[in-house]
Regions:
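Mid-domain Rossmann-like dinucleotide-binding core that forms the NAD(H)/NADP(H) cofactor-binding site
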Residues: 136, 143-145, 149-234, 238-239
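Rossmann-fold dehydrogenase core element
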Residues: 272-273, 287-329
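Cysteine-cluster motifs in flexible loop/terminal segments that predominantly coordinate metals
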Residues: 85-143
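Residues in the short beta-alpha loop(s) of Rossmann-like NAD(P)-binding domains
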Residues: 9, 213, 280, 305
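Glycine-rich beta-strand-centered segment in the early N-terminal region that forms part
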Residues: 21-35, 46-96, 101, 147-151
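C-terminal hydrophobic helical "lid"/dimerization subdomain
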Residues: 246, 250, 262-266, 310-361
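Glycine-rich cofactor phosphate-binding loops and adjacent beta1-alpha1 units
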Residues: 175-179, 191, 201-202, 212, ...
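Residues located in well-ordered beta-strands
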Residues: 2-4, 14-19, 31, 62-64, ...
């Protein structure tokens, strides 16, 4: 099969022929139909988050089941599925206490003594975040996918595999945004836009989108933002405090920078909560004024929207088909696998929301 392989940090992906194993007892072979090109992939490409190489990138996909292992009963050949990087074992402490997105059990992968899922001759190709979706086939644990209804368009379904679940889930689960509350979202990429859409679904009052790209701010309005702030033209913190008469109940950082994380904290009203969704580079320290804790302000992280994806993702599919979740506007362009490097380069400019690889092209 063809796959986009990362062999060295800060180098383009190479389209190569890679071999894939047969499904083990609890594994599922999936033929991707669509895969989103996510900004998170860039963090691993540029070395901000070190990863075992070579690897096949990609972690946001939807496809059709091709084959299942002998012990798999949840899906069968022909089922439509969304994949999820936060595969769960189902019996560790995180899983049994309801925190499935924090499961780190190695059993959702193959053990060192087993043959690798992906290889090129004698060379192991490491699987990326339990998935590796920039490939014509995926071999994954049965707990890394969820069945969906067949009338859901696959390119839209792919977005639910990461950006939508991460952004909407941060609003619903991590922060628990309440109706009528004021919200600010810093960064209007795929995840930030999903958080804005989620805040609108949750019934937030004022929803403030903060970015430096006019086209993204306009897109944010179509997804539910009531106000927009161009952070390149003003003091974003001051503007938010003036609009809200003292600060937001909830803020979301969706870029992954020290400065914007600190701004998310500064935009809070007393008692407010800042949720950091963005991937801050390893080794980066964030500075907060300690006295602010006396105002009962809170800051927290969010991993994949604190999801329970087998419950959440089918609901998000229904939200889309019922007109609540707006995914059509999120797709900037459909591309071929061979165009993945151009899509990743476009992400670096910050101009586009999402490129989606379509494997029938």
């Amino acid at each position: 099969m063809k796959a986009a392989v990362l062999r060295e940090a800060n180098t383009p992906l190479e389209i190569e022929e890679v071999s894939i194993s047969k499904p083990g007892p609890r594994e599922v072979l999936v033929r991707p139909v669509a895969a989103g090109v996510c900004h998170s992939d860039l963090h691993f490409m540029d070395g901000s988050y070190p990863y075992a190489l070579p690897t096949i990138l990609g972690h946001e996909s939807a496809g059709i089941v091709e084959e299942v292992g002998s012990d798999v009963t949840y899906v069968k050949k022909g089922d439509h599925v969304i994949t999820c990087l936060s595969a769960f074992c189902g019996h560790c402490d995180q899983c049994i206490t309801g925190h499935l997105s924090l499961c780190a059990s190695p059993e959702v992968g193959r053990m060192p003594e087993e043959a690798p899922r992906l290889h090129k001759g004698d060379e192991t190709i490491h699987q990326f975040l339990n998935l590796s979706s920039f490939a014509e086939l995926m071999l994954i644990h049965e707990h890394a996918l969820v069945k969906i209804r067949e009338d859901m368009p696959m390119d839209r379904a792919a977005l639910i595999g990461c950006s939508t679940t991460t952004g909407v889930g941060a609003v619903f689960h991590t922060a628990g945004v309440e109706p009528g509350s004021n919200v600010a979202v810093i960064g209007c990429g795929g995840v930030g836009l999903a958080a804005i859409n989620g805040a609108a679904i949750a019934g937030a009052g004022m929803i403030i989108a903060v970015d430096m790209v006019d086209s993204k701010l306009e897109l944010a309005k179509s997804l539910g933002a009531t106000h927009t702030i161009d952070a390149g033209q003003c003091d974003a913190v001051g503007e938010v405090k003036e609009l809200t008469q003292g600060g937001c109940h909830y803020t979301f950082e969706a870029i992954g920078l020290k400065a914007t994380t600190e701004q998310a904290w500064q935009m809070l009203r007393p008692g407010g909560a800042a949720t950091v969704i963005g991937m801050i580079p390893v080794g980066t320290m964030v500075e907060l004024h300690g006295v602010d804790f006396l105002a009962e302000k809170k800051i927290q992280g969010s991993n994949m929207g604190s999801n329970r994806f087998r419950v959440d993702m089918p609901r998000f599919v229904d939200f889309y088909l019922n007109g609540k979740l707006h995914l059509d506007q999120m797709i900037s362009k459909h591309i071929k696998l061979s165009e993945v490097n151009e899509a990743l380069a476009a992400l670096k400019t910050g101009q586009d929301a999402r490129h989606v690889i379509m494997f029938d092209q």
